[in-house]
């Protein structure tokens, strides 16, 4: 193994290797969470007409006292005649105001009679929504790289779009190596364990916006590794292999990747857990495949995926690779490692001075249950002694609303 590189350098190499994927049109009903491939410029005004903000009566300029009610304007069924002095038109919220409308008076402020209405003095412009006051034609309503949230989908629909031009979602193959791995739901042989990495990593792929192309367990065999990895490289945009990347006699993943033409970018990161992480690229005629060799220990696999593969999957879609980060105050001291930065599983809570991070307890890389209580990974820089309580540290969020914040109003 070469000299381990810092986390920031490893991420830089990963992100600099990325070629954005091609774009496709996605119906709005299927576009939640997708990433825009281009700016969206509105061709329409929103709202498309001057309308009423209240149920009431549309009034001409200077109207007060007794007015003749000459008609009604309903949402979707506008009154088409212009307002004249001494008249009013009953109007519903959201309905277009007739030509000549100066204001709308709410229904609760008037006295109605037979065909007439008594109205108080009403200032011009009252309760009238102007055409284009939300969006003007030519406005950029969403930028390339925006992730489509429910409000964003609503905005697209409001400007008349039925689909969005989005970057294609990356296809991600997940392989787990080891003779001991057994599919969950089957009986364990002596010395075997149920394979947890494929399903855990698949969940991280989906959370990053990718599509799981396959999950597969592979025995500790050089030929089997070459075949499985070769098949994955042929069909996926990203290949993640857990296990087999260290220096043991049964670690065949690095050799298989190199034999298949994958160009190594780095092997070894100054990180705990996750030191043996491997990354490389394979260039084909019309595409580039990213290949990650992740440690086999379950926590190490999830941590290194979060730090390196997840930003890559986001960047392939044109999304901000570093969006899910924050700064927090350590609530208790953490011993530093002299040669490696540490990704410490932590629980986040909110306080007046910002987020606070408290380690979840034992940090062994095989203890997957330790991830259950974690909202984030606090990055503790290498050095002597300890990171004291009160120190501000960078935190990689693990997804969703941190549990310590979920009860906030």
What label would you give each PLM region?
Residues 2, 7-8, 13, 58-219, ...:
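Short, glycine/charged-enriched hinge/interface segments at domain edges or termini
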Residues 1-7, 162-294, 298-304, 315, ...:
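Helix-rich terminal scaffold detector
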Residues 36, 48-49, 79, 87, ...:
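Short, conserved secondary-structure segments in the cores of folded domains
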Residues 24-29, 37-38, 135, 256-409:
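Flexible glycine/proline-rich
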Residues 15-22, 39, 97, 139, ...:
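Structural signal for hydrophobic packing residues in well-ordered secondary-structure cores
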Residues 26-28, 43-68, 100-114, 316, ...:
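Short beta-strand/loop turn elements enriched in aromatics
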Residues 1-68, 319-343, 407-409:
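Short, low-complexity N-terminal leaders and the immediately following helix N-cap/first helix
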Residues 32-45, 78-90, 136, 279-280, ...:
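Short, hydrophobic/aliphatic alpha-helical segments
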